[in-house]
Amino acid sequence: MKVYEFGDKNKPGIMLFPGTCCYWKSNFGHVLENLQEHFYTMVVSYSGFDETENTTFISELDEVEKVEAYIKNKFDGKIFAAYGCSLGGSLVSLLVGRQNIHIDHAIIGSSDMDQAPKWLAKIETAIMIPLFYPFITGKNDCFLSRKMDKRLQQGGESAEY
């Protein structure tokens, strides 16, 4: 794993996590300049994804442990923000959930919507908002909401990290 760093180290740090099989420059190259106006910007390039390394991606947990070590070593265990899309969103979630480091603001994106052209993102958003709004607000007693509540009350298997 490599972390590419850009900008002024005195600014708040934001760490970017690309999606599955995505080259970090393809995901974030077009936003680095603007982000550097406000943030010290770090972009993670996962093991096995970087052209400068001969490594293998083992697992999400393996990469998370490397990122935790990096943040502890370089930033005393705390960064201002982290953004992850797709696979990167999973890694950001794990970083927050494990509580081995501190991230003030964790942003979890979906490569389907946050990287789509505006016209497509608007259509996708128009479809998704009516589906998820009841779950987020709890204001709508729709069939899906009742079904989800019933499923949550039953419990089930969960993965431990």
Describe the residue ranges of each PLM region.
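Structural signature of beta-strand start/N-cap positions in the alpha/beta core
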Residues: G13, Y40, I79-A81, D104-H105
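Aromatic pocket-lining residues of Rossmann-like dinucleotide-binding sites
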Residues: L35, L95-Q99
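Short beta-strand immediately N-terminal to the catalytic nucleophile in serine-hydrolase-like folds
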Residues: A82-G84, G109
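Gly/Ala-rich beta-loop-alpha elbow adjacent to hydrolase catalytic centers
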Residues: G84-V92
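Flexible "cap/lid" loop of the alpha/beta hydrolase fold
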Residues: G97, I103-F135
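Conserved alpha/beta-hydrolase catalytic His-Asp/Glu region
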Residues: P117-K122, P134-Y161
